[in-house]
């Protein structure tokens, strides 16, 4: 392991010490809590949408969340280990066969829906036993 990888690994450990990042994938509906500073006030803003892309690059990992806001599609890119992200919550798991869901940009309405990934009873029982 070279020096840069070692430093990045230590930085990731430092940034994730006070928060947990859940496992999520493209197709999942997530709520990203973002720290917003307005003047001297600091508040948390929730951004809910579908993850259409995830970029795994160590410390530079990022993901794109798409939502429909007043009839208009809005996409926002988040850095996974950014201090501006207060937390990430997975609302529902999506069942998709692609890593990048850029085709959702051309779709609207019912054709832009993503099927929910259903967990089998055996997997649910194993998870409950943990």
Swiss-Prot record:
This protein is located at the 30S-50S ribosomal subunit interface and may play a role in the structure and function of the aminoacyl-tRNA binding site. Keywords: Ribonucleoprotein, Ribosomal protein. The lineage of its organism: Bacteria, Pseudomonadati, Pseudomonadota, Betaproteobacteria, Burkholderiales. It comes from Cupriavidus taiwanensis (strain DSM 17343 / BCRC 17206 / CCUG 44338 / CIP 107171 / LMG 19424 / R1) (Ralstonia taiwanensis (strain LMG 19424)). NCBIfam families: rplS_bact. GO terms for biological process: translation. It holds the Pfam family Ribosomal_L19. The keyword Ribosomal protein applies. The keyword Ribosomal protein applies. One of its GO terms (molecular function) is structural constituent of ribosome. This is Large ribosomal subunit protein bL19. Belongs to the bacterial ribosomal protein bL19 family. One of its GO terms (cellular component) is cytosolic large ribosomal subunit.
